[in-house]
Design a protein with these regions (language model features):
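HIT superfamily nucleotide-processing domains
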Residues: 1-349
Length: 349
């Protein structure tokens, strides 16, 4: 039996680490010698748009909202959108998926397969033009999470909705088309390959050991402590063992929860605290970096997934994919997750 080690101390300049969920190998290339402080950006290059012409700052005259919150309370409206909104959900003007009454598949030349991209695309917009989520209060972040959950519960009832993706692109390098902070919700009629693989591996582990692999990892991380950057009663935020990028953070519930849409009020508050801590640390430690965060949760296709465990991934844009990453499909991180976590732990929430 292989000897277990509580601590991960790299002595060889590079190390391959296995992601237990995806079964992907990642490279921790510490031989490149980057210290945590090196990742901090001195000047952030962003496209500036004045609030006077920002479409989200002038939303009252443009969009038909699906959901409006004002200072923690859901509000109704008639005709005109009230000016005191703080978080709002609107349809995306440029959707990749469109609602349709039919879901059709076609085969071209007994070779290529197509289907119509049936679905819904929405934007979750916060009020302040210049405040990223890292600068919002815990209360304001909870309002965003309230919006995620409420829209999820509504969209999962729609026809041809089998998966709901919730994500946030912050900054130019992360693909944000508008500097005004906003998240996106997109529904799809199918389940992507990566999620199918995660579901398959999670189920196999559950069948073999009668335990959730995510719960097992959380227990190990709580004991080891070296990769933990924040912890409260309900949530754990870590730099994962097989980080796909420098300063990657995963936030997951300590309890076994397969379905994000079933999150309770208490859990939403705990998740808001974890998000605030993680995003604030990245903001301070990396100099307001561009980043993506996204939800991993069980599909809403009517099947049961008791072995899955929802979680959020935050990926700062600390490096770009080059030829090796694209060709070998293997990410390289130039800092140990343990050192990244140690650096972030020292920073305030």
């Amino acid at each position: 039996m292989e000897k277990q080690s509580k601590k991960s101390n790299l002595k060889f300049p590079s190390e391959l680490r296995l992601d237990l969920i995806s079964k992907d190998w990642v490279v921790i290339a510490t031989g490149r010698g980057k210290k945590p402080e090196v990742f901090k950006k001195e000047k952030k290059e962003e496209v500036k748009i004045s609030p006077k012409i920002c479409p989200f700052c002038n939303i009252e005259t443009q969009e038909l909202p699906l959901l409006i919150f004002s200072h923690g309370k859901k509000i109704s409206y008639k005709g005109k959108i009230p000016g005191n909104w703080t978080t709002i959900d609107i349809p995306n003007k440029f959707p990749a998926f469109l609602p349709h009454s039919k879901f059709e598949k076609k085969i071209e030349g007994n070779l290529y397969q197509t289907m119509n991209a049936v679905g819904f695309c929405e934007l979750v917009v916060t009020r302040d033009h210049d405040k990223s989520l890292a600068l919002l209060s815990i209360k304001d972040i909870k309002e965003v999470i309230d919006t995620y959950q409420e829209r999820y519960l509504d969209l999962m009832k729609k026809k041809f909705v089998n998966y709901i993706a919730i994500f946030h692109n912050q900054g130019l390098r992360a693909g944000a088309s508008q500097p005004h902070p906003h998240s996106q919700i997109i529904t799809t009629p199918l389940i992507d390959v990566d999620l199918n693989r995660a579901l398959f591996n999670s189920e196999n582990y559950y069948k073999k050991d009668k335990k959730c692999i995510y719960c097992q990892m959380n227990e190990w991380e709580k004991r080891a402590k070296e990769r933990v950057i924040f912890e409260n009663k309900d949530f754990l935020a870590i730099c994962p063992f097989a980080s796909k990028a420098a300063f990657e953070v995963i936030i997951s519930p300590k309890s076994h929860l397969p379905y994000f849409e079933k999150i309770t009020e208490k859990e939403k508050l705990g998740l808001s605290e974890a998000f605030k801590a993680a995003l604030s640390k990245l903001y301070t430690g990396l100099g307001d970096p561009s980043y993506n965060f996204y939800l991993h949760t069980a599909p809403c296709d009517g099947k049961k997934y008791p072995y899955y465990h929802w979680h959020w991934t935050i990926l700062p844009k600390t490096a770009a994919w080059a030829g090796f990453e694209m060709g070998a499909q293997m990410e390289i991180s130039t800092i140990e997750p343990e050192k990244a976590a140690e650096y972030l732990r020292k920073l305030g929430n």
